[in-house]
């Protein structure tokens, strides 16, 4: 998720990068962007010394000021709202595909005579692709811009949706799902970057909320998969034809959507202002793309093994993210087998994520107020630990919701009780994900692209593991104790949030990459 390095726009003291490195190579005519003290992405001296030959990527956004009149953060509110809504809606579209896969699973098991574990490969390979895609699609979006990556990845995504719809064997379906996951990962990295392009520091919470909310709306894929797959006039293949139709609609919208990458927007503005030819198709080389991709990957691996904050949060988020797919499997033995609901009614219970995010919306202003108050208390200095103020309370909803679902899913207890437990779990789950992502970008502003990549890789790999582990657990344990086991496993993880809130500043003080104190330019607010 390379592009999420812009999720939190951090004002920091400028360094003095080389002029040649600051040139934005987007066309034949290179115009130096408007510079100021407020760098969007500043590379740490430590990093430059050790990676002098691969630092092009880190310099990409250096010196671009949000005070420039052409900067996307200075656009009209309606234009920014449209871009945020469209970009985050893409996340809903891409992620309803792994959510509708349970509707496909039974059909492909019967069609190609597969075991239950093998039949899950389509879903798990999609999630694996989402984990791997940002490692090279992220740097590509910083070279070509958000718009071209959106359109290009969507075209490939739609092509392989057609491949899934016409699959002649299971291998074709699995390989196509893997490629769909890789190119569909733009719904994580590119979307987060585009949202950060148009929203400043003070508004980032709301942008991340929309990012998380559209993830919850993707849960509509569960009943959609059941309804379409069970319709004899449609069958499971029509789920992928629906993806093709909706994907074509998104392609058309993005063709008429403006570019948001500040480097390109400012470049074109300066070219127009000076009467120079405007470069609408950025130039780049495969060598430069390879260098930038290598930089993100190299630093991501280095950060994961050398920074305990990132590695611990990444593993925690792998558990958190994996439980979403765990409960996608758990709803069937509970609501179909215990409560005797129809397939459609049982699949609709997975949409408990949507009211959970609506509830989060009501408390988002409180989190923003607490965050601003914390900055005032610390002399207007951004403190990453302030992202966890509300999390200290939300984190307890994680085991509470899991245990409610585990031990209240019984015939003599109304199903609404277990649904409330599932909703409480989702409230905690989505809030923790949002808080951890913002914490990582705040704590590692100089290498945030690689830090987020290091954070997200184990997160999605955890989801891959839980897809297969959950099926194994439910085949060998009853649903009550299978769910209780993950509930007990979540208890020690509560300590991690408290440890980072109270001792995170001391841990960051020992890091060469983490930021201890990030000054805020109050004049900009």
From Swiss-Prot:
Q: Give any single GO term for biological process.
A: export across plasma membrane
For the modification Phosphoserine, the affected residues are 55
Q: Which SUPFAM superfamilies match?
A: MFS general substrate transporter
Q: Where in the cell is it found?
A: Membrane
Question: Looking at the keywords, is Membrane present?
Answer: yes
User: Which residues are listed as membrane-spanning?
Assistant: 81-101, 120-140, 147-167, 173-193, 208-228, 238-258, 295-315, 318-338, 350-370, 388-408, 413-433, 454-474, 484-504
- Note the topology in the membrane: Multi-pass membrane protein
Matching CDD domains: MFS_Tpo1_MDR_like
Q: Which Pfam families match?
A: MFS_1
Q: Which GO terms describe its molecular function?
A: pyridoxal transmembrane transporter activity; pyridoxamine transmembrane transporter activity; pyridoxine transmembrane transporter activity; transmembrane transporter activity
Superkingdom to which the source organism belongs: Eukaryota
Instruction: Cite the entry's keywords alphabetically.
Output: Membrane, Phosphoprotein, Transmembrane, Transmembrane helix, Transport
Query: Does the keyword section mention Plastid?
Result: no
CC annotations in GO: cytoplasm; plasma membrane
Q: Which PANTHER family match?
A: MAJOR FACILITATOR SUPERFAMILY (PTHR23502), PTHR23502:SF183
UniProt record similarity statement = Belongs to the major facilitator superfamily. CAR1 family.
* The protein's name in its UniProt record: Uncharacterized transporter C576.17c
């Amino acid at each position: 998720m390379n592009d999420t390095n812009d999720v939190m726009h951090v004002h920091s003291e400028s360094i003095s990068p080389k002029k040649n490195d600051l040139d934005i190579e987007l066309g034949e005519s290179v115009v130096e962007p408007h510079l100021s003290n407020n760098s969007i992405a500043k590379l740490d001296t430590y990093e430059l010394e050790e990676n002098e030959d691969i630092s092009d990527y880190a310099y990409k956004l250096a010196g671009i000021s949000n005070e420039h009149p052409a900067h996307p953060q200075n656009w009209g509110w309606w234009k920014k709202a449209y871009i945020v809504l469209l970009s985050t809606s893409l996340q809903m579209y891409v992620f309803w595909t792994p959510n509708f896969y349970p509707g496909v699973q039974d059909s492909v098991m019967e069609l190609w005579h597969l075991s239950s574990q093998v039949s899950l490969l389509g879903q798990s390979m999609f999630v694996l692709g989402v984990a791997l895609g940002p490692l090279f699609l992220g740097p590509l979006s910083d070279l070509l811009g958000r718009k071209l990556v959106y359109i290009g990845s969507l075209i490939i995504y739609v092509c392989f949706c057609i491949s899934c719809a016409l699959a002649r064997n299971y291998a074709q379906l699995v390989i196509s799902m893997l490629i769909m996951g890789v190119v569909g990962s733009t719904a994580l990295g590119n979307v987060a970057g585009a949202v950060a392009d148009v929203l400043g520091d003070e508004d980032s919470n709301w942008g991340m909320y929309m990012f998380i909310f559209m993830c919850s709306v993707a849960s509509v894929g569960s009943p959609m998969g059941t309804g379409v797959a069970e319709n004899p006039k449609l069958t499971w293949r029509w789920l992928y034809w629906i993806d093709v139709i909706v994907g074509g609609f998104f392609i058309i919208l993005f063709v008429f959507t403006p570019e948001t990458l500040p480097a390109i927007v400012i470049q074109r503005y300066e070219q127009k202002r000076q009467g120079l030819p405007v470069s609408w198709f950025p130039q780049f080389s495969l060598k430069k793309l390879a260098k930038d991709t290598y930089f993100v990957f190299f630093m991501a691996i280095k950060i994961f093994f050398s920074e305990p904050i990132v590695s611990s949060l990444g593993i925690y988020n792998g558990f958190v993210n994996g439980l979403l797919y765990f409960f996608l499997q758990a709803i069937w033995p509970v609501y179909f087998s215990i409560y005797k609901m129809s397939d459609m009614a049982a699949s609709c219970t997975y949409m408990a994520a949507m009211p959970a995010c609506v509830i989060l919306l009501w408390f988002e202003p409180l989190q923003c107020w607490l965050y601003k108050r914390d900055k005032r208390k610390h002399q207007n200095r951004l403190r990453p630990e302030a992202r966890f103020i509300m999390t200290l309370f939300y984190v307890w909803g994680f085991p509470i919701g899991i245990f409610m679902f585990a031990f209240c899913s019984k015939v003599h207890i109304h199903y609404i009780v277990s649904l409330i437990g599932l909703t409480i779990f989702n409230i905690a789950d989505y809030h923790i994900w949002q808080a951890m992502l913002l914490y990582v970008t705040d704590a590692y502003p100089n290498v945030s692209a690689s830090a987020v990549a290091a954070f997200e890789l184990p997160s999605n790999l955890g989801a891959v593991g839980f897809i297969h582990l959950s099926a194994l657990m439910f085949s060998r344990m009853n649903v009550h104790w299978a769910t209780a086991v993950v509930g007990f496993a979540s208890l020690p993880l509560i300590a991690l949030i408290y440890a980072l809130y109270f001792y995170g500043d001391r841990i960051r003080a020992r890091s060469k990459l983490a930021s201890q104190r990030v000054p805020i330019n109050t004049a900009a607010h």
